[in-house]
A protein has these predicted regions:
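Catalytic machinery of carbohydrate-active enzymes
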Residues: 1-239
Length: 239
C-alpha cells in the first residue's frame, strides 16, 4: 500500500483548491492511504471528504514543541510520498524530520509560492502570473513528476454532518448560487461592481453570500437585487 501525506495548514480557499488533487492521487495509485496535516480549525472542512483516510490537526497554540511531537508521530507512519502544498516554516520543519534525506523515500514534492511574482503583484501592482490564473492548477503541477497528471472532478459523496443537512436542506435550492467574495488580500478580491453585474446577468438565480463579519462590502452586493440575494456575512462558520 502507498502512503501519501499532504501538508496544507490553511487557509480555507487554498485548502479547497488543494482538495482537487485527491482524485488524481487515488487514480494514480490503486491502493493508497491519504493523510493530510492541517490547522486545527480547518479539520471540519477536510472531514467532509471521505477520500482522506486520516486528518492530522495541528494546534498552533502548542507552538514548536507541538509541531516537533507531531513530526515525530508522522515519521512513524513511513510515508512513501510527501507533498508540501504550503511551503512555510512549519512545513519545512516537518519535512526536515519526516524526510531528512533526499532521493530516498519518502519522496517530496513542493508547491512553489512564486514569491517574486507575488511581491511584484501585491506591492507594485505588476502581474506576471498566468492569465487567467487558476490556483487549483498551481496545486496540481508539482505532482506531475510522480505521474499524477489527471485530476477527476466528479466526486459528490460529501460527508456533511446530520445537523448541517437538517438545518439547510430546505434553504438550499437548485437555482441557488453561493458567492464567496472576500479574501485576506484586497488585491485578490473581485471588484464589488463585478459581483453586482454577475447578479444582474443571472436574473433566474438566487444568491447567498458567505463571508466574514468584517466584510461589510457584501451588503452592497446584496443591494443589486435584495429580493434574490441573501447576505450571510459573519453569520456562518467553516462547518
Amino acid at each position: 500500500m502507498t502512503k501519501f501525506l499532504i501538508i496544507r495548514f490553511s487557509s480555507i480557499g487554498d485548502i479547497i483548491q488543494c482538495m482537487g488533487i485527491i482524485g488524481g492521487i487515488r487514480e494514480r495509485f490503486a491502493d493508497v492511504e491519504i493523510h493530510w496535516i492541517t490547522r486545527k480549525d480547518m479539520v471540519g472542512t477536510l472531514s467532509m471528504d471521505g477520500r482522506i483516510d486520516k486528518i492530522w490537526a495541528f494546534d498552533k497554540e502548542t507552538g514548536l514543541a507541538g509541531l516537533l511531537k507531531m513530526a515525530a508521530d508522522l515519521r512513524k507512519e513511513h510515508f512513501d510520498y510527501i507533498y508540501d502544498a504550503h511551503s512555510n516554516i512549519r512545513s519545512n520543519i516537518l519535512k526536515l524530520i519526516v524526510s531528512p534525506l533526499p532521493f530516498v523515500k519518502p519522496y517530496v514534492a513542493l508547491r512553489s509560492k512564486e514569491r517574486g511574482k507575488r511581491f511584484l503583484l501585491f506591492k507594485l501592482g505588476i502581474n506576471h502570473f498566468d492569465k487567467p490564473f487558476r490556483g487549483m492548477v498551481s496545486f496540481q503541477k508539482p505532482l506531475k513528476k510522480w505521474g499524477i497528471t489527471h485530476f477527476p472532478d466528479n466526486y459528490h459523496d460529501w460527508c456533511f454532518p446530520d445537523e448541517i443537512r437538517s438545518k439547510y436542506e430546505n434553504f438550499v435550492t437548485k437555482d441557488m448560487v453561493t458567492l464567496v467574495p472576500s479574501a485576506n488580500w484586497e488585491m485578490k478580491r473581485w471588484p464589488v461592481s463585478y459581483w453586482k453585474e454577475l447578479v444582474a446577468l443571472l436574473p433566474e438565480y438566487r444568491f447567498v453570500i458567505l463571508a466574514g463579519p468584517k466584510d461589510t462590502f457584501c451588503e452592497e452586493i446584496r443591494s443589486a437585487a435584495p429580493e434574490r440575494v441573501v447576505n450571510l456575512a459573519g453569520q456562518t462558520s467553516l462547518m
